[in-house]
Amino acid sequence: MSATQGSWETLTYQSPVLPIHAALLSPGADGRAKVLFLAGSGNNPDTTGELYGSAVWDYEQGTFSRPVTPLNSAGNPIDFFCAGQSFLADGRLLVMGGTERYDPFEGLSDTLAFDPKTLEWTIVQSMESGRWYPTAVTLRDGNVFACSGKEENGFLDTYPEIYSPSIGWSVVNPTPNPPTSPLGMYSAIFLLRDGRLFYSGGYFDNNNGVSPRLLTLPTPPGTITEQPVGGLTDMNSRDQSASVLLPPADQQQVMIMGGGNSFYGTATNSVNIVQLSTAARAVSNPTYKVAPALKYARMHHSAVILPDRTVFVCGGSGMGESGAMATKAGEIYNPATNTWTEAASEEVVRLYHSVALLLPDGRVISVGGNPARDSQELRISVYKPPYFFKGTRPVINSAPVKVAYGASFQIQTPQARAIKWVNLIRPSAATHSCDTEQRLQNVVINSRTSTALNVTLTSNRNLAPPGFYMLFITDNNNVPSIAKWIQITP
């Protein structure tokens, strides 16, 4: 069954922290990519001092290191539990907000950056407003858009901010300009071809009556404009659903799948897809359409884009945080055929505060789970998709380490004649079923010899924001290579 369903392995060691957030880091000083796990206070108000924190997993070596968490002005570790996260063009992970207070929750304004080269945290300029459960999206210029989340006073923030590495944070719609609609916490938002942002309708806890919509960012001092997008079924049952910009990104289709009608409510298996633009132009009035349903109703699940241009879904439960109704079986969606296939079952139950992401070798890791404050799932699972069992994988012998927008470049591979696709996949930075970072962008094949591909990168910065990407080649059997890292320079 491995050739159709893939296979799971539970590793013999565990994470030293609860991986509420996970981000794939570009290669460090030793040349190896690693995964950063973030716990902060780990959903435990009694956690103090050295127990706050993060861990860097060297998955090739099977080892962990523990970066020192910076201290706030009161001398306490900054608590990035339930922060927002997004990658900067230089590979650093920007982490904004977090937990100022428990019960009732209030957000932090602190902002940190994690450097994959030094494996160290640094403090950068704080936001204007605190944010707990915010959304962060990297823009075409490498700046980061942050919205929603609870402020220092516990109310939902409706004034987005943008972070520039050169000047810090600035409010997009400063008062007295009107705020945005009250976008839900951890809103699933994606950058589109034309620079607009799309809120899919996925959220945490409450959508506040806000439907899916397109957001057009202003030229200062203008204000954000919004265009509602209709057609989404079960709009009020998308709590901790999963959304993806379907591969390849230039097709501009967004899928939303699953979700619940409340934090402890019943999950849905419904799936919707919306076409937001064509190669020629934006769709003037995009509308969601019903797509084939998941086999299993899910919330708290993860959706991961694979280098064979499919989407792998794992984890979650048919009802809130119920382990008894947990879904262990995975599912794989193929956009080319518009069909779902059941995948292998994971041994470990993954519920609230679980996360999954793609590794450069094509495997998927699944970690975390925290259905109650006294329950922490530290085991690590690794999934091998079906392409691991379909024959020899193509090999990238060499490729550039940096490339500019619109540039042509060479990929050396002995399988050049058999290559079907060249893909760039942006590394994940995921939490709470929300991953605004991951996207797969097609790289056009211009010509080939028996040992090389001549390809051209898109000139559209919105389709592939600046930063580090995994470069995969995929053969005619839909079997991908191991990735090479490449940096798109601003």
Question: Language-model features: where?
Answer:
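Kelch-like beta-propeller repeat domains
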Residues: 1-490
